[in-house]
């Protein structure tokens, strides 16, 4: 993705500049985490890559989104349908709304196979479905093939969503906060499984979350977004150990440290601006404790601060 900007139509018809000059890369076999508060543009970014934004809601787009040899912004819906599910797939946040309550687990996971392999027999579809469910952590997949979503636990529904994404062995998996509704033990188990599957298959993973603690457990690289702008990116371990942007540092300070330091999270003062009320300069300037007059004159450029590390700040930490 290079220089990607997106303007959507608001509910009142006004244009909303949601994403601005977004630029990052996901390499083969790599797990890239995308972090930021709710409203930062993370999910819209994912929907843009997947081609799932309604055409009627898009006012303007600029830049490029490349997937291997494909320019995704040039594909029509029919061409995108051939790519979506087979070469790229998405794990959505809430399985009870993303899954069809009237379809069995076998039919829902197998639907993708039938769509991309029209000549596949039922036995061939079943083989793929069982393998995908096993990869997603079902110890005994055959036992649940006839189950409906309401008959599965929350953890099983999340695993079913993962199986639906993995069934065609896509090159890219996008996971949008897939463990939000689960308890800590299930989150760790599912994230570990997701990371192992991506690495074992040579797939790539884009993992979206507002929780840096969760992202730290699964990602190789970290992209931090604020108000539709990437403010910092780099190797996850380095960035977490020594953040350069005040917003990244504030997100890290917001993590609870109850075991070693025994202190509560430190909230970030203020609120995320709406897309039509972003500050004229740095998008974080209204909430930044380090803000100076120069920060309000224009959006800072992305500056390289080390190997594969970028920060969009005039006065990095």
What are these regions (language model features)?
Residues 70-71, 123-143, 252-253:
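Conserved ABC ATPase "signature" region
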Residues 60-71:
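Conserved ABC transporter NBD signature motif
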């Amino acid at each position: 993705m290079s220089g990607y900007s997106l303007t959507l139509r608001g509910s009142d018809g006004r244009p909303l500049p949601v994403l601005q000059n977004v630029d990052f890369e996901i390499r083969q076999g790599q797990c890239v985490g995308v972090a930021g508060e709710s409203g930062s543009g993370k999910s819209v970014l994912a929907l843009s890559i997947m081609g799932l934004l309604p055409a009627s809601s898009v006012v303007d787009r600029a830049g490029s989104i490349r997937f291997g040899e494909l320019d995704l912004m040039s594909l029509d819906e029919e061409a995108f349908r051939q790519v979506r599910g087979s070469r790229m797939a998405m794990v959505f946040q809430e399985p009870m709304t993303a899954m069809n309550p009237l379809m069995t687990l076998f039919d829902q996971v197998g639907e993708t196979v039938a769509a991309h392999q029209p000549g596949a027999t039922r036995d061939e579809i079943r083989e793929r479905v069982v393998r995908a469910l096993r990869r997603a952590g079902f110890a005994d997949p055959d036992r649940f093939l006839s189950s409906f979503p309401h008959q599965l636990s929350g953890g099983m529904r999340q695993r079913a969503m993962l199986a639906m994404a993995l069934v065609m062995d896509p090159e890219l998996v996008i996971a949008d906060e897939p463990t939000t509704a689960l308890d800590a033990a299930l989150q760790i188990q599912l994230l570990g499984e997701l990371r192992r599957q991506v690495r074992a298959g040579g797939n790539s993973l884009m993992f979206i979350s507002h929780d840096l603690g969760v992202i730290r457990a699964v990602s190789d690289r970290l992209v931090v977004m604020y108000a539709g702008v990437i403010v910092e990116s780099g190797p996850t371990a380095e960035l977490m150990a020594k953040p350069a942007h005040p917003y990244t540092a504030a997100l890290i300070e917001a993590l609870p440290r109850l075991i070693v330091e025994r202190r509560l999270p430190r909230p970030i003062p203020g609120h995320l601006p709406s897309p039509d009320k972003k500050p004229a300069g740095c998008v974080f300037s209204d909430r930044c404790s380090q803000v100076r007059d120069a920060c309000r004159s224009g959006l800072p450029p992305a500056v390289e601060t080390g190997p594969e590390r970028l920060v969009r700040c005039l006065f990095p930490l």
